[in-house]
């Protein structure tokens, strides 16, 4: 039985994507069909940091957080300016409607009143159709979700970009994530009760995690009716505990072929109705990247994944039912 939370119109759109020959449910195509136009996500940094840093943080995250290289996306720039400048630039490229994407960091790590001010302001632009908010599973208190639920009731498309990484407790402890699998499950269910959509971020190639466990993560997220996923390879960057493990020979990153093969396997074990927002990372600055050496470009990875799935004669969801 296929597990889905999407409505009938969304299901029709995804079925149409497959009928056109695509081998996985590409989010960009889905959005274009749903809204009859492309929608641009404006990334903004509101400088909220991460509550887990005081506990040492995750082993893959540097002390100061991951740098991003998007022009006009910086906590040093007022939010109004970040939105205005990026919106102006994207309008020149033909975009008319936008999501505001709160990234990086834990973007619910602030009092509810402050967050409401930020979210209200972001939605005050007539061109903005919704929000996408990156956060941790243990930082989604009821009062904050209730505010987001009001936006849903008013017709906005609200997404939580949730740092899942893995659905295995052992792995979360190795990563020093600072939360349990139960927190992930609760966060997803709490969002769904309010009509808030969830995009789970998943990392493949985590220390100590087996192929079977990675595939179980795909199936569990499907059974939790998650709407979308972003899939990433684990990247070793300077100034992290993971870097120490790497130089000691305690961890090795996946090579390109290993990663692409795992992505294909993961997609096969995922419900065909989970949207795929990403299959790789943004470019990691060479100044801080330790490993892997291969190019992480999203378009390249997406094309190679499509090529391998085609060679296998398979597609997303092919092994979800087994």
UniProtKB/Swiss-Prot annotation:
**UniProt-annotated binding residues for [4Fe-4S] cluster:** 50, 58, 61
Q: Does the keyword S-adenosyl-L-methionine apply?
A: yes
GO MF term list = 4 iron, 4 sulfur cluster binding; catalytic activity; metal ion binding
CDD domains the record matches: Radical_SAM (cd01335)
Q: Which InterPro entries match?
A: ELP3 (IPR039661), Elp3/MiaA/NifB-like_rSAM (IPR006638), Radical_SAM_C (IPR032432), rSAM (IPR007197), rSAM_horseshoe (IPR023404), YhcC-like (IPR005911)
The entry's keywords: 4Fe-4S, Iron, Iron-sulfur, Metal-binding, S-adenosyl-L-methionine
Q: How is the cofactor bound?
A: Binds 1 [4Fe-4S] cluster. The cluster is coordinated with 3 cysteines and an exchangeable S-adenosyl-L-methionine.
Sorted alphabetically, which Pfam families does this protein's record hold? Answer: Radical_SAM, Radical_SAM_C
Q: Where is the Radical SAM core domain?
A: 34-286
List, separated by semicolons, the cofactors it needs.
Answer: [4Fe-4S] cluster
Query: Which NCBIfam families does the UniProt entry name for this protein?
Result: TIGR01212 family radical SAM protein (TIGR01212)
Q: Which family does it belong to?
A: Belongs to the radical SAM superfamily.
What protein name does the entry list? Uncharacterized protein MJ0486
Native organism: Methanocaldococcus jannaschii (strain ATCC 43067 / DSM 2661 / JAL-1 / JCM 10045 / NBRC 100440) (Methanococcus jannaschii)
């Amino acid at each position: 039985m296929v597990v889905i939370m999407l409505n009938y119109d969304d299901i029709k759109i995804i079925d149409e994507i497959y009928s056109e020959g695509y081998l996985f449910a590409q989010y960009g195509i889905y959005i274009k069909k749903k809204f009859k136009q492309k929608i641009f996500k404006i990334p903004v940094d509101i400088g909220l940091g991460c509550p887990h840093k005081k506990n040492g943080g995750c082993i893959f995250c540097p002390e100061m957080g991951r740098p991003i290289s998007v022009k006009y996306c910086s906590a040093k720039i007022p939010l109004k300016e970040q939105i205005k400048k990026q919106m102006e630039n994207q309008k020149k490229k033909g975009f008319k409607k936008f999501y505001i994407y709160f990234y990086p960091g834990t973007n619910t790590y602030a009092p509810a009143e402050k967050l409401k001010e930020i979210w209200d302001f972001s939605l005050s632009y007539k061109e903005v159709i919704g929000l996408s908010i990156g956060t941790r599973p243990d930082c989604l208190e009821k009062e904050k979700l209730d505010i987001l639920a009001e936006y849903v009731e008013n017709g906005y498309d609200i997404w939580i970009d949730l740092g899942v990484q893995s659905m295995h407790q052992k792995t979360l402890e190795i990563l020093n994530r600072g939360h349990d699998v139960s927190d992930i499950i609760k966060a997803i269910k709490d969002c769904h009760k309010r009509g808030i959509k969830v995009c789970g971020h998943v990392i493949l190639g985590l220390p100590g995690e087996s192929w079977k466990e990675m595939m179980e993560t795909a199936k569990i997220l499907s059974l939790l009716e998650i709407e979308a996923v972003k899939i990433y390879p684990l990247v070793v960057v300077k100034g992290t505990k993971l870097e120490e493990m790497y130089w000691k020979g305690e961890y090795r990153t996946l090579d390109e072929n290993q990663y692409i093969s795992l992505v294909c396997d993961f997609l096969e074990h995922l419900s065909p109705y989970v949207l795929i927002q990403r299959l790789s990372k943004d470019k990691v600055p060479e100044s801080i990247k330790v490993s892997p050496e291969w190019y992480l470009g999203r378009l390249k990875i997406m094309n190679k994944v499509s090529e391998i799935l085609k060679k296998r004669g398979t597609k997303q969801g092919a092994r979800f039912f087994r």
